[in-house]
Amino acid sequence: MALNISVKVHPVVLFQIVDAYERRNADSHRVIGTLWGTSDKGVVEVTNCFCVPHKEHADQVEAELNYAMDVYELNRRVNSSESIVGWWATGNEVTNHSSVIHEYYSRECREPVHVTLDTSLAGGRMGLRAYVCVPLGVPNGKQGCMFTPVDVTLTCYEPEIVGLQVCQKTVSGGGRGSSGVAAGSDLAQVMSAASSLESLLEQALQYADGAAAGAPADAEAGRALLQLAHSAPDLAKDTFSDAFASSVKDLLMVVTLAQLIKTQLQLNEKLTLLTSPVNTTIYKGRPNV
Protein backbone atom coordinates (compact mmCIF):
# COMPACT_ATOMS: atom_id res chain seq x y z
CA MET A 1 0.00 0.00 0.00
CA ALA A 2 1.48 3.31 -1.07
CA LEU A 3 1.25 6.06 1.52
CA ASN A 4 1.45 8.90 -1.03
CA ILE A 5 -2.30 8.73 -1.54
CA SER A 6 -4.69 11.64 -1.01
CA VAL A 7 -8.44 11.60 -0.46
CA LYS A 8 -10.89 14.24 -1.67
CA VAL A 9 -14.39 14.18 -0.17
CA HIS A 10 -17.43 16.01 -1.53
CA PRO A 11 -19.83 17.77 0.88
CA VAL A 12 -22.77 15.54 -0.07
CA VAL A 13 -20.86 12.59 1.41
CA LEU A 14 -20.59 14.32 4.78
CA PHE A 15 -24.29 15.21 4.71
CA GLN A 16 -25.22 11.59 3.99
CA ILE A 17 -23.02 10.29 6.82
CA VAL A 18 -24.56 12.71 9.30
CA ASP A 19 -28.05 11.80 8.08
CA ALA A 20 -27.32 8.08 8.52
CA TYR A 21 -26.01 8.76 12.02
CA GLU A 22 -29.17 10.69 12.94
CA ARG A 23 -31.36 7.83 11.65
CA ARG A 24 -29.43 5.03 13.38
CA ASN A 25 -31.06 2.53 15.71
CA ALA A 26 -31.23 3.35 19.40
CA ASP A 27 -28.76 0.57 20.27
CA SER A 28 -26.22 1.51 17.57
CA HIS A 29 -23.22 3.50 18.74
CA ARG A 30 -21.45 3.53 15.38
CA VAL A 31 -22.62 3.65 11.78
CA ILE A 32 -20.63 2.35 8.81
CA GLY A 33 -21.12 2.39 5.07
CA THR A 34 -19.58 2.20 1.62
CA LEU A 35 -17.69 4.99 -0.13
CA TRP A 36 -18.39 5.53 -3.80
CA GLY A 37 -16.20 7.44 -6.26
CA THR A 38 -13.11 7.21 -8.43
CA SER A 39 -9.44 6.46 -7.90
CA ASP A 40 -6.78 7.69 -10.30
CA LYS A 41 -3.03 8.24 -9.92
CA GLY A 42 -3.01 8.22 -6.15
CA VAL A 43 -6.03 10.51 -5.76
CA VAL A 44 -9.25 9.02 -4.38
CA GLU A 45 -12.27 11.25 -4.99
CA VAL A 46 -15.33 10.30 -2.93
CA THR A 47 -18.54 11.58 -4.54
CA ASN A 48 -21.22 9.43 -2.92
CA CYS A 49 -21.82 6.92 -0.15
CA PHE A 50 -24.48 4.74 1.42
CA CYS A 51 -25.05 3.18 4.82
CA VAL A 52 -24.66 -0.56 5.51
CA PRO A 53 -26.68 -1.84 8.50
CA HIS A 54 -24.51 -3.81 10.90
CA LYS A 55 -24.08 -4.95 14.49
CA GLU A 56 -20.80 -5.12 16.38
CA HIS A 57 -20.28 -7.78 19.02
CA ALA A 58 -17.29 -8.45 21.22
CA ASP A 59 -15.74 -11.00 18.87
CA GLN A 60 -17.46 -10.50 15.52
CA VAL A 61 -19.23 -8.09 13.18
CA GLU A 62 -22.57 -8.80 11.51
CA ALA A 63 -23.38 -6.80 8.38
CA GLU A 64 -26.27 -7.01 5.91
CA LEU A 65 -24.15 -7.75 2.85
CA ASN A 66 -27.14 -8.56 0.64
CA TYR A 67 -28.46 -5.05 1.21
CA ALA A 68 -25.03 -3.61 0.43
CA MET A 69 -24.84 -5.54 -2.85
CA ASP A 70 -28.34 -4.43 -3.89
CA VAL A 71 -27.50 -0.76 -3.30
CA TYR A 72 -24.20 -1.30 -5.10
CA GLU A 73 -25.98 -2.63 -8.19
CA LEU A 74 -28.40 0.32 -8.15
CA ASN A 75 -25.51 2.78 -8.01
CA ARG A 76 -23.78 0.99 -10.87
CA ARG A 77 -26.87 1.46 -13.01
CA VAL A 78 -26.99 5.17 -12.28
CA ASN A 79 -23.27 5.86 -12.72
CA SER A 80 -21.18 3.09 -14.22
CA SER A 81 -18.00 5.20 -14.23
CA GLU A 82 -17.75 5.13 -10.42
CA SER A 83 -17.10 2.21 -8.10
CA ILE A 84 -16.37 1.30 -4.49
CA VAL A 85 -13.28 3.09 -3.17
CA GLY A 86 -13.49 2.24 0.54
CA TRP A 87 -15.72 2.56 3.55
CA TRP A 88 -16.65 5.10 6.22
CA ALA A 89 -17.52 5.03 9.90
CA THR A 90 -18.67 7.53 12.49
CA GLY A 91 -16.43 8.25 15.45
CA ASN A 92 -13.05 9.79 16.10
CA GLU A 93 -10.93 6.63 16.25
CA VAL A 94 -10.23 3.28 14.64
CA THR A 95 -11.71 0.41 16.65
CA ASN A 96 -10.78 -3.26 16.95
CA HIS A 97 -13.50 -4.20 14.47
CA SER A 98 -12.15 -1.87 11.78
CA SER A 99 -9.61 -4.41 10.53
CA VAL A 100 -12.35 -7.01 10.03
CA ILE A 101 -14.52 -4.58 8.07
CA HIS A 102 -11.53 -3.37 6.06
CA GLU A 103 -10.69 -6.94 5.10
CA TYR A 104 -14.12 -7.28 3.49
CA TYR A 105 -13.69 -4.08 1.47
CA SER A 106 -10.23 -5.23 0.38
CA ARG A 107 -12.03 -7.94 -1.58
CA GLU A 108 -14.42 -5.41 -3.13
CA CYS A 109 -11.82 -2.93 -4.40
CA ARG A 110 -8.08 -2.49 -4.66
CA GLU A 111 -6.46 -0.45 -1.86
CA PRO A 112 -9.63 0.78 -0.10
CA VAL A 113 -9.52 3.90 2.05
CA HIS A 114 -11.17 4.31 5.43
CA VAL A 115 -12.80 7.65 6.30
CA THR A 116 -13.98 8.56 9.81
CA LEU A 117 -16.27 11.45 10.70
CA ASP A 118 -16.54 12.48 14.34
CA THR A 119 -20.29 13.02 14.75
CA SER A 120 -19.88 13.37 18.52
CA LEU A 121 -18.27 16.79 17.94
CA ALA A 122 -15.33 16.10 20.22
CA GLY A 123 -13.34 19.28 20.61
CA GLY A 124 -16.21 21.37 19.28
CA ARG A 125 -15.78 20.36 15.63
CA MET A 126 -16.61 17.50 13.30
CA GLY A 127 -13.24 15.92 12.63
CA LEU A 128 -12.68 14.28 9.24
CA ARG A 129 -9.86 11.76 8.85
CA ALA A 130 -8.76 9.24 6.23
CA TYR A 131 -6.66 6.09 6.63
CA VAL A 132 -5.09 3.35 4.59
CA CYS A 133 -4.34 -0.11 5.95
CA VAL A 134 -0.69 -1.14 5.88
CA PRO A 135 0.14 -4.85 6.40
CA LEU A 136 2.61 -5.66 9.17
CA GLY A 137 4.40 -8.81 10.24
CA VAL A 138 7.46 -10.98 9.70
CA PRO A 139 7.95 -13.57 6.96
CA ASN A 140 6.44 -16.93 7.88
CA GLY A 141 5.20 -15.40 11.11
CA LYS A 142 2.21 -13.64 12.56
CA GLN A 143 0.65 -11.07 10.25
CA GLY A 144 -1.28 -7.92 11.14
CA CYS A 145 -2.19 -4.50 9.83
CA MET A 146 -2.01 -0.86 10.89
CA PHE A 147 -4.21 2.07 9.88
CA THR A 148 -2.03 4.97 8.77
CA PRO A 149 -3.47 8.50 8.30
CA VAL A 150 -3.35 10.08 4.84
CA ASP A 151 -4.17 13.55 3.57
CA VAL A 152 -7.89 14.30 3.24
CA THR A 153 -9.43 17.49 1.87
CA LEU A 154 -12.86 18.75 0.90
CA THR A 155 -13.58 19.42 -2.75
CA CYS A 156 -16.65 20.83 -4.48
CA TYR A 157 -18.19 21.10 -7.90
CA GLU A 158 -19.50 24.55 -8.82
CA PRO A 159 -23.18 23.61 -8.17
CA GLU A 160 -22.16 22.27 -4.75
CA ILE A 161 -20.49 25.59 -3.92
CA VAL A 162 -23.74 27.42 -4.67
CA GLY A 163 -25.65 25.01 -2.43
CA LEU A 164 -23.14 25.42 0.39
CA GLN A 165 -23.38 29.19 0.15
CA VAL A 166 -27.16 28.96 0.52
CA CYS A 167 -26.75 26.60 3.49
CA GLN A 168 -24.31 29.06 5.05
CA LYS A 169 -27.08 31.67 5.15
CA THR A 170 -29.15 29.42 7.44
CA VAL A 171 -26.45 29.42 10.12
CA SER A 172 -27.98 31.76 12.67
CA GLY A 173 -28.68 30.83 16.30
CA GLY A 174 -32.32 30.20 15.54
CA GLY A 175 -32.00 26.44 15.99
CA ARG A 176 -34.40 24.00 14.42
CA GLY A 177 -37.21 26.52 14.36
CA SER A 178 -35.40 28.92 12.04
CA SER A 179 -37.03 29.53 8.68
CA GLY A 180 -35.52 28.22 5.46
CA VAL A 181 -33.64 30.30 2.90
CA ALA A 182 -34.57 30.19 -0.77
CA ALA A 183 -31.88 29.90 -3.43
CA GLY A 184 -33.04 33.08 -5.19
CA SER A 185 -33.12 33.98 -8.85
CA ASP A 186 -30.13 33.84 -11.19
CA LEU A 187 -29.83 37.61 -11.28
CA ALA A 188 -29.88 37.80 -7.47
CA GLN A 189 -27.10 35.21 -7.30
CA VAL A 190 -25.02 37.21 -9.80
CA MET A 191 -25.50 40.36 -7.72
CA SER A 192 -24.52 38.51 -4.55
CA ALA A 193 -21.42 37.06 -6.24
CA ALA A 194 -20.43 40.51 -7.54
CA SER A 195 -20.83 42.01 -4.06
CA SER A 196 -18.72 39.22 -2.54
CA LEU A 197 -16.06 39.70 -5.23
CA GLU A 198 -15.96 43.43 -4.53
CA SER A 199 -15.44 42.75 -0.82
CA LEU A 200 -12.61 40.30 -1.55
CA LEU A 201 -10.92 42.79 -3.88
CA GLU A 202 -11.06 45.44 -1.17
CA GLN A 203 -9.39 43.03 1.27
CA ALA A 204 -6.68 42.26 -1.30
CA LEU A 205 -6.05 45.98 -1.88
CA GLN A 206 -5.82 46.63 1.85
CA TYR A 207 -3.35 43.76 2.22
CA ALA A 208 -1.22 45.03 -0.70
CA ASP A 209 -1.24 48.61 0.63
CA GLY A 210 -0.25 47.38 4.09
CA ALA A 211 2.60 45.29 2.69
CA ALA A 212 3.83 48.26 0.64
CA ALA A 213 3.76 50.41 3.78
CA GLY A 214 6.03 47.97 5.63
CA ALA A 215 3.55 45.66 7.38
CA PRO A 216 4.52 41.96 7.75
CA ALA A 217 3.62 40.10 4.55
CA ASP A 218 3.31 36.48 3.50
CA ALA A 219 5.40 35.51 0.47
CA GLU A 220 2.94 32.83 -0.62
CA ALA A 221 0.03 35.29 -0.49
CA GLY A 222 2.07 37.78 -2.50
CA ARG A 223 2.79 35.23 -5.21
CA ALA A 224 -0.90 34.30 -5.36
CA LEU A 225 -1.88 37.97 -5.77
CA LEU A 226 0.75 38.46 -8.46
CA GLN A 227 -0.51 35.41 -10.35
CA LEU A 228 -4.06 36.74 -10.07
CA ALA A 229 -3.01 40.13 -11.42
CA HIS A 230 -1.22 38.55 -14.39
CA SER A 231 -4.20 36.32 -15.19
CA ALA A 232 -6.52 39.33 -15.57
CA PRO A 233 -6.87 40.53 -19.20
CA ASP A 234 -5.16 43.82 -20.02
CA LEU A 235 -8.20 45.78 -21.20
CA ALA A 236 -8.99 49.45 -21.20
CA LYS A 237 -11.69 50.63 -18.80
CA ASP A 238 -14.18 51.40 -21.58
CA THR A 239 -13.54 48.07 -23.31
CA PHE A 240 -14.01 46.16 -20.06
CA SER A 241 -17.23 48.05 -19.28
CA ASP A 242 -18.63 47.25 -22.73
CA ALA A 243 -17.71 43.56 -22.41
CA PHE A 244 -19.25 43.36 -18.94
CA ALA A 245 -22.45 45.09 -20.09
CA SER A 246 -22.69 42.69 -23.02
CA SER A 247 -22.35 39.70 -20.69
CA VAL A 248 -25.08 41.07 -18.41
CA LYS A 249 -27.38 41.55 -21.41
CA ASP A 250 -26.75 37.96 -22.49
CA LEU A 251 -27.57 36.75 -18.98
CA LEU A 252 -30.79 38.76 -18.87
CA MET A 253 -31.77 37.39 -22.29
CA VAL A 254 -31.20 33.80 -21.11
CA VAL A 255 -33.25 34.41 -17.95
CA THR A 256 -36.09 35.95 -19.99
CA LEU A 257 -36.15 33.09 -22.49
CA ALA A 258 -36.12 30.53 -19.67
CA GLN A 259 -39.11 32.22 -18.03
CA LEU A 260 -40.98 32.32 -21.37
CA ILE A 261 -40.34 28.62 -21.98
CA LYS A 262 -41.47 27.78 -18.45
CA THR A 263 -44.68 29.79 -18.90
CA GLN A 264 -45.36 28.18 -22.28
CA LEU A 265 -44.91 24.69 -20.86
CA GLN A 266 -47.27 25.43 -17.97
CA LEU A 267 -49.87 26.86 -20.36
CA ASN A 268 -49.53 23.88 -22.69
CA GLU A 269 -50.04 21.50 -19.77
CA LYS A 270 -53.27 23.25 -18.74
CA LEU A 271 -54.58 23.31 -22.34
CA THR A 272 -53.80 19.62 -22.73
CA LEU A 273 -55.84 18.80 -19.64
CA LEU A 274 -58.78 20.86 -20.94
CA THR A 275 -58.81 19.43 -24.47
CA SER A 276 -58.03 15.79 -23.69
CA PRO A 277 -61.04 13.44 -24.06
CA VAL A 278 -62.52 12.00 -20.91
CA ASN A 279 -61.99 8.25 -20.66
CA THR A 280 -65.26 6.52 -19.76
CA THR A 281 -65.82 2.86 -19.12
CA ILE A 282 -69.17 1.33 -20.15
CA TYR A 283 -70.35 -1.56 -18.02
CA LYS A 284 -72.33 -4.07 -20.09
CA GLY A 285 -72.91 -6.66 -17.42
CA ARG A 286 -76.19 -7.43 -15.74
CA PRO A 287 -76.79 -5.18 -12.74
CA ASN A 288 -77.31 -6.70 -9.34
CA VAL A 289 -80.89 -6.44 -8.07
From Swiss-Prot:
Q: Does the keyword Protein biosynthesis apply?
A: yes
Q: Which GO terms describe its biological process?
A: formation of cytoplasmic translation initiation complex
MF GO annotations: metallopeptidase activity; translation initiation factor activity; translation initiation factor binding
What UniProt keywords apply to this chain's record, in alphabetical order? Cytoplasm, Initiation factor, Protein biosynthesis
Q: Which Gene3D superfamilies match?
A: Cytidine Deaminase, domain 2 (3.40.140.10)
Q: Name the domain of life this protein comes from.
A: Eukaryota
Occurrences of domain MPN (ranges): 7-137
A GO CC term attached to the entry = eukaryotic translation initiation factor 3 complex, eIF3m
Major location (coarse): cytoplasm
Q: Does the keyword Protein biosynthesis apply?
A: yes
Q: Which Pfam families match?
A: JAB, MitMem_reg
Q: Where in the cell is it found?
A: Cytoplasm
Oligomer and partners = Component of the eukaryotic translation initiation factor 3 (eIF-3) complex.
Q: Which family does it belong to?
A: Belongs to the eIF-3 subunit F family.
Known role: Component of the eukaryotic translation initiation factor 3 (eIF-3) complex, which is involved in protein synthesis of a specialized repertoire of mRNAs and, together with other initiation factors, stimulates binding of mRNA and methionyl-tRNAi to the 40S ribosome. The eIF-3 complex specifically targets and initiates translation of a subset of mRNAs involved in cell proliferation.
* The protein's name: Eukaryotic translation initiation factor 3 subunit F
Tell me the organism: Bombyx mori
Gene symbol of the encoding locus = eIF3-S5
